[in-house]
Each structure stands twice: as structure tokens, then as C-alpha cells.
Amino acid sequence: MAEQIGGQIFIDTWGLVNPGAPQRAADYGQTAASVSHDGNGVYGARFMCAAIAKAFETSDIDEIVDAGLRELPEVCTYRSVMEAVRAFHKAHPENWRDCMELLFRDWGYDKYPGVCHIIPNAGVCMMALLYGEGKFDRTVEIATMAGWDTDCNAGNVGTILGVATGIAGIPRKYLDPINDAIVCSGISGYLNILDIPSFCREAALLGYRIAGEEAPQDLKKAYRPGEVYFDFELPGSTHNIRLSDPFRCRA
């Protein structure tokens, strides 16, 4: 349990609320992951949170990866698999499938206990980041096509690239079907169905609070706890509104 993938798959928000502060993001991620994980399970949380936080400052994948690696111990299996994938990419940058063969051979599920160990999937995340070449869609697609824990790996690298490229870098083929929906997994069910703009504003306010900075007034006014408030101010926002009878609801 301690080193299964759960340590890095539910901590993206700690990177989002610590923009430009990789070390602080990693510390928050470690605290969250340590509730149920340890060792490499926690190191994965540190890497992902730091990478997301760094992506607010740069879209350069090497800089983002370096920020994540700086938050790992010098000697640990998590660092080893990430560096192995990076070295392979440097020598063979043409085809991610060749790198996947490396992961199957040296870092596969057969090497680790449990049903979904973090190490093989960490390798997939690094592979997708490098071979995706800074493109949101290609990065997510590689993480998915690689197999293993497809949704978790695509989610982690998708968060990193989503921050790095901004909404302009996310193709309509992803934006339109999702339609600003976000589904959480909290204990209180009524809090689990959200829309992305509302989530973004709440995360932004929390980020200002963590940083000890005053949030802009327009952001404060746009977030109204306990209310349903849609202003469509964020670019491309739909607030997950769906029409049941589009024939009668033409624009």
C-alpha cells in the first residue's frame, strides 16, 4: 500500500495552489500523501506537485522536470526510474514505444509488489512528458496509450501541461466533451459535482491565502460560497451548463 500510485494521483491541487513555489508545493503534497503512503509513494507526490507549481513559470519541459527532481532524495527508486527514462529519451528521442519497451523490461509491474505500484507509472509519466514535446494532447495521449494506470498518469501529466500551455494549448476535442465538468471524490457528496471555473476561483483564492497575499477584489467578488454563481468571465467557460432541448434554445 505505502508505495502504490495513490501517493501521486490525488495531489495535483497542491501544485495548483502554490504557483511558482515548487518546494512549498512539494511539502504540501508530501503532507497529504503521507496520510496513506510512504517512501516512493510520497516522493511521487513531491515530484508532481513541484512540477505543476513550476509550470506556472515556464513551459519548458526540462525546467519543469528539473524542478520536480530537485524535490526528491538523491538516492531513491523514484529518481532512478525518472533519470533512466530521461537518459533513454536523450539517446532515442524518435519513438516513445521504444522507451516503453525499456519500462517493460527494467521497471515493469512484475518487479514490484501490489496491483498498481508507483514506480512503473512514474516512468510512464516521465516518458509522456518528454516524448510529448510540450504539446498537451500528445502528452496525454502517450500517457494513455502506454497502458498501466492510464487515467492517473494522463491526469498527472495533463495537469502539468494544462498549466504550462494554458487553455489556448488544449484542443477543442478535449474541451468540448468535458464542458467545464469536474467530479471530485470527497466524503460530502453534494460538494463533488463542480464546474471548472468555480473550482479554479476557489483554488486561486486558496493560493493567495497560502502565499500570504491579498487576492484581487474582482476574484473575491466572483467567488460566493454556498451560492450558484456563473459569470462566464473566464475564457471559453460554460460552467457545465447543458441544454436538454437545443431546438428551443438556439443562440
Question: What role is predicted for each listed range?
Answer:
Residues I5-G7, G41-Y43, F47:
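Hydrophobic, membrane-interfacing alpha helices
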Residues I61-I64, P93-E101, A168-R172, R201-Q217:
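Long, charge-rich low-complexity segments
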Residues F47, G68-E71, V85-R86, I160, ...:
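A glycine-rich phosphate-binding loop feature that marks nucleotide/adenosyl-phosphate handling sites
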Residues I11, G15-A21, Q30-V35, C49-G147:
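Accessory "access/gating" subregions that flank catalytic or transport cores
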Residues H37, M48, C125-L205:
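Catalytic phosphate/nucleotide-handling subdomain of diverse soluble enzymes
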Residues R24-A32, A45-R46, P177-D180:
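Short, conserved phosphate-binding/catalytic loop or strand-edge motifs used
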Residues G186-A251:
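Catalytic cores of secreted or luminal carbohydrate-active enzymes
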Residues M1-E3:
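Acidic catalytic motifs of isoprenoid enzymes
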